[in-house]
From Swiss-Prot:
GO terms for molecular function: structural molecule activity. Residues 1-10 have a biased composition (Basic and acidic residues). Gene3D superfamilies: 1.25.40.570. This is Probable 26S proteasome regulatory subunit rpn-6.1. It comes from Caenorhabditis elegans. One of its GO terms (cellular component) is nucleus. PANTHER family: 26S PROTEASOME NON-ATPASE REGULATORY SUBUNIT 11/COP9 SIGNALOSOME COMPLEX SUBUNIT 2. Disruption phenotype: Embryonic lethal, larval arrest. The lineage of its organism: Eukaryota, Metazoa, Ecdysozoa, Nematoda, Chromadorea. Residues 1-30 are annotated as: Disordered. Induction: By daf-16. InterPro entries: 26S_Proteasome/COP9_Components (IPR050871), PCI_dom (IPR000717), Rpn6_C_helix (IPR040780), Rpn6_N (IPR040773), WH_DNA-bd_sf (IPR036390).
Length: 438
C-alpha cells in the first residue's frame, strides 16, 4: 500500500504498517488519556465526511476499515452493521473491485464477532447480497453468496448450503471465475462430508483441485484444500498414512500465513492419524518438533491423553480422556466420526493386554478386569479370533478362552529351504548345459 500524506487532526489514520504516522490504534498506545470511544467518534466523523480527491478517498477507505476493526474488537455488532449501511453511498462512487473488497472485509469483521445469533449473521449477508443485486454488482454478489455458503457450513446448516452452492457453481462456471469457484466447491465438499455423503464430497473436492491447478492459489486456500483432502482420505479409505501427509502440508501452509487456529486443527488431526496408525508413541516426538513447539492448548492436551491411553492399552483411560475433553473430542466432527473405530481399537488393545499372561483365562475374569458386560467381551473375542487378531478359541461351555501359543518361525529352517531351492536350480542348469554338449 503506498504511503499517503495525512492531515494534522487525523494522526495519520490508515491500516498499512508502511505509513509513517501509523494508525489511530498505534497512536492510542502512546496516548493513554484517550480511549476507544474517542477514536470511534473521530473515525466516525471521518467516515461521514464527504471525500473529494484521491487522497481523501484513500483516507476514508482506511478510516472505514480501522473503525470496523475497532467496533469488531469491542463487539459492537449493531454499530458495525449500521456503519456498513452508512458507507454504501460512498461505496457506489468507488470502483467495483475496490468496493467489493471493502464490503467483504467489513462483512467478515461482523461475522467474526462471537455471541451472535446465526439468523442475524445470515440476515446481514443476505441484506448485502440484495444491495449488490440492486446495484448490479455481479462479482460482489457472487463473492457474498460464496461467503453465505461458508457461513451455512459454519452454522452446521449443511442442507441449506448445498443448493446455494450448486446454483453458484453453475453460474461461476459460465463466467469462468475460477478463484471463487474453488472456494465454493471446497465448501460444497465440506457440506457433503458432514452429511456423510463421502462420494459426493470427494467429487466436489476433485473439482476444486482441478480448478485450482489452472490458477494461482494463495497459501491459505491451498492449505484448506490439503486439510479437506486429509479428512476425506481418513474417512473414505481409512488411509491414515496419506491423510497424515495432507494434514502436514495443511499445517505448514496455515503456519506460513499465521493462521494459528487452522494450523492447530491440522496438527490435531496429524496426532489423530498417529493414534489410528497404532503409533501413539510418536505423538510426543511430533509435538516436540521445531514447527509445533509454539502451539499448545486443550486440543493438543486431548490428543496427548488419547495417545497416552493407547500406549497403556487402557480402555478406561481412553474413556476418561474422551469425557474430560468433550469440546475438543466429542464436538469435533472429524474426531467424532472416528470415535467408534477408536473405541473398538482401544477395546482390542485392552483385551490383548489382559489376556497376554494367560494360556487359559475365564471370560468372566476378563470382563471384570475391563469393566464391561461379559456378553460384549465374548462377542468381541469371537470377532478378534475370526479376524485373526487373536490366536485362540472359546470354550463357551466352560466360559473359558484358550490362548494358543504363536510359534516363532525358525529362520534357519527357511534359510535351509532357500539354499536347497537354489542348489536345485544350479543342478538343473548344469544338466541342461551337459545335454547340449552331448
Amino acid at each position: 500500500m503506498r504511503e499517503t500524506s495525512s492531515r494534522e487532526d487525523t494522526n495519520n489514520i490508515g491500516k498499512a504498517p508502511e505509513m509513517s504516522g501509523g494508525t489511530i490504534m498505534d497512536t492510542m498506545t502512546s496516548l493513554p488519556h484517550q480511549n476507544d470511544q474517542n477514536v470511534i467518534r473521530h473515525l466516525t466523523n471521518l467516515v461521514k465526511s464527504p471525500a473529494s480527491g484521491d487522497d481523501d478517498i484513500k483516507k476514508k477507505e482506511d478510516s472505514i476499515m480501522e473503525l470496523g476493526n475497532i467496533l469488531a474488537q469491542n463487539k459492537q455488532t449493531e454499530e458495525l452493521r449500521n456503519m456498513i449501511e452508512q458507507t454504501r453511498p460512498f461505496l457506489v462512487s468507488l470502483g467495483k473491485a475496490k468496493a467489493a473488497k471493502l464490503v467483504r472485509d467489513l462483512v467478515d469483521l461482523c461475522l467474526k464477532i462471537d455471541d451472535q445469533d446465526g439468523d442475524i449473521k445470515v440476515g446481514l449477508v443476505k441484506e448485502c447480497i440484495q444491495w449488490a443485486t440492486e446495484q448490479n454488482r455481479t462479482f460482489l454478489r457472487q463473492t457474498l453468496t460464496a461467503r453465505l455458503v461458508r457461513l451455512y457450513n459454519d452454522l452446521q446448516r449443511y442442507t441449506q448450503a448445498l443448493p446455494l452452492a450448486a446454483d453458484l457453481i453453475r453460474e461461476l462456471k459460465k463466467v469462468d471465475d475460477k478463484d471463487v469457484l474453488v472456494e465454493v466447491e471446497l465448501e460444497e465438499s465440506k457440506a457433503y462430508y458432514n452429511l456423510s455423503n463421502i462420494g459426493r464430497a470427494r467429487a466436489s473436492l476433485t473439482g476444486a483441485r482441478t480448478t485450482a491447478n489452472a490458477i494461482y492459489v494463495n497459501p491459505r486456500m491451498q492449505a484448506a484444500l490439503d486439510l479437506q483432502s486429509g479428512i476425506l482420505h481418513a474417512a473414505d479409505e481409512k488411509d491414515f498414512k496419506t491423510a497424515f501427509s495432507y494434514f502436514y502440508e495443511a499445517f505448514e501452509g496455515y503456519d506460513s500465513v499465521d493462521e494459528k487456529v487452522s494450523a492447530l486443527t491440522a496438527l490435531k488431526y496429524m496426532l489423530l492419524c498417529k493414534v489410528m496408525l497404532d503409533l501413539p508413541d510418536e505423538v510426543n516426538s511430533l509435538l516436540s518438533a521445531k514447527l509445533a513447539l509454539k502451539y499448545n492448548g486443550s486440543d493438543l492436551d486431548a490428543m496427548k491423553a488419547i495417545a497416552a491411553a493407547a500406549q497403556k492399552r487402557s480402555l478406561k483411560d481412553f474413556q476418561v480422556a474422551f469425557g474430560s475433553f468433550p469440546q475438543e473430542l466429542q464436538m469435533d466432527p472429524v474426531v467424532r466420526k472416528h470415535f467408534h473405530s477408536l473405541s473398538e481399537r482401544m477395546l482390542e488393545k485392552d483385551l490383548c493386554r489382559i489376556i497376554e499372561p494367560y494360556s487359559f483365562v475365564q471370560i468372566e475374569h476378563v470382563a471384570q478386569q475391563i469393566g464391561i458386560d461379559r456378553s460384549k467381551v465374548e462377542k468381541k473375542l469371537s470377532q478378534m479370533i475370526l479376524d485373526q487378531k487373536l490366536s485362540g478359541s472359546l470354550d463357551q461351555g466352560e466360559g473359558m478362552l484358550i490362548v494358543f501359543e504363536i510359534a516363532v518361525p525358525d529362520e534357519a529352517y527357511q534359510t535351509a529351504l532357500d539354499t536347497i531351492h537354489a542348489m536345485g536350480e544350479v543342478v538343473d542348469a548344469l544338466y541342461s548345459n551337459a545335454s547340449k554338449i552331448n
